[in-house]
Amino acid sequence: MRIATWNVNSLKARMPRVVDWVARFNPSVLCLQETKMASDAFPHSAFEEMGYESVHNGQGRWNGVAILSNVGLDNVCYGFDDGKPEDPDARIIWATCNGVRVASAYIPNGREVGHEHYHYKLDWLSRLRSHLELNNDPSENLAILGDFNVAPEDRDVWDINSFKGATHVSKPESCLLYTSPSPRDVEESRMPSSA
């Protein structure tokens, strides 16, 4: 199964490119972030014509995440199933695709350390952990894809000195994301060593 992710930063603006890319590479599953459209504006029929089922968690001109699949979409969950109030931001959607639990996630940016948006980001990451602890069977396949807005290692940014004390590289963000119940950074494991 070929699974891909793409922060499209406006699906309306990128739709021709997305259609071309999907036709060229034919992924089994494609996760999209920053669709920036309401749920009722999502082009389900265009993807259906290409052989894809689709689900979308939209929010108008902000955020928005989607999953496209040509191997089935079951058990769709919008947001977190963690017993807390619904998140007003459309930042995550879950579905089971051919036996793999897939999430398309757009983790908050955080703006700056100490800012209310940073605290929202930390809370969001805590909710992700809680959702996984409550709903994820460690023996089942899981793929969380998307725009994580977290760089856990110095080599993950072009100049670590310019990021000192900033969001994306803070210890609390990295600890919440990369010590969660099962995540393993596949991107890192397939990238060639810089040494």
Q: PLM features: what roles do these ranges have?
A:
Residues 12-22:
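Short, acidic/polar
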Residues 107-125, 163-165:
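Surface-exposed cleft-lining segments at the edges of enzyme active sites
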